[in-house]
């Protein structure tokens, strides 16, 4: 349904939280981050704590929106509530980490970073069929590899699989791919942030 597609797109737009996280930990962009460089606590501790707080906060919001859709709007989105909540948690974690990655490598201004996020997320959503229903089928026919690495397609396919398949193999592949991509983006973001910190000293 249109509501469920909007919800899946919203899971990716939580990347905004990751962009703010990156800015707040870049000494060349934020006075707060500059103060952190001389704080006794390790920079890694700040980053982990803020990332965890962002994930918890955004996950609560996304879960609340999900429960509103299924309980109030009465739109069926899954037959496996527990796994659906896991999907939301993994999707939110990926999105925030993705936003942090874009915040680390993107333009210097916050507006530029936000623009980069929209310029990246919207094509992902389009190719996954969240903007035009049959697009994912077209991509699957002509370039299936895109559906295997497109985060929007993986999130959408996770919910689709929970609704339509008894086997969890495809669902597990989607979730594990998202987790792997999250880990890679986090490592790269941490290294870039650390390099910027050293450069600012």
Identify what each model region corresponds to.
Residues 42-69, 84-85, 89, 93, ...:
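Selective transmembrane-helix segments that form parts of the transport pathway or gating/packing helices
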Residues 2-7:
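Short, small-residue-biased leader/transition segments that mark boundaries at the very start
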Residues 12-17, 49-50, 79-87:
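Short alpha-helical transmembrane interface motifs in multi-pass membrane proteins
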Residues 79-201:
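Membrane-spanning alpha-helical segments of multipass transporters and channels
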Residues 18-39, 43:
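Transmembrane helix boundary and interhelical loop/hinge segments in multi-pass membrane proteins
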Residues 38-39, 44, 196-201:
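Hydrophobic transmembrane alpha-helices and immediately adjacent juxtamembrane helices
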Residues 70-78:
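Membrane-interface helix termini and inter-helical loops of multi-pass transporters
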């Amino acid at each position: 349904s249109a509501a469920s597609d909007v919800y899946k797109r919203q899971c990716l737009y939580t990347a905004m939280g990751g962009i703010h996280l990156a800015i707040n930990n870049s000494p060349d962009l934020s006075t707060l981050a500059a103060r952190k460089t001389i704080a006794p606590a390790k920079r890694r501790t700040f980053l982990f704590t803020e990332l965890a707080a962002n994930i918890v906060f955004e996950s609560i919001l996304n879960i609340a929106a999900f429960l509103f859709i299924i309980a109030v709007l009465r739109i069926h989105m899954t037959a496996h509530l527990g796994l659906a909540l896991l999907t939301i948690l993994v999707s939110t974690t990926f999105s925030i980490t993705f936003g942090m990655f874009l915040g680390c490598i993107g333009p210097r201004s916050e507006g530029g970073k936000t623009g980069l996020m929209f310029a990246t997320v919207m094509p992902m959503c389009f190719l996954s069929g969240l903007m035009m229903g049959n697009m994912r089928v077209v991509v699957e026919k002509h370039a299936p590899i895109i559906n295997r690495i497109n985060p929007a397609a993986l999130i959408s396919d996770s919910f689709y699989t929970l609704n339509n398949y008894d086997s969890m193999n495809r669902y597990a592949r989607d979730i594990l791919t998202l987790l792997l991509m999250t880990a890679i983006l986090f490592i790269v973001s941490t290294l870039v942030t650390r390099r910027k910190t050293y450069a600012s000293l």
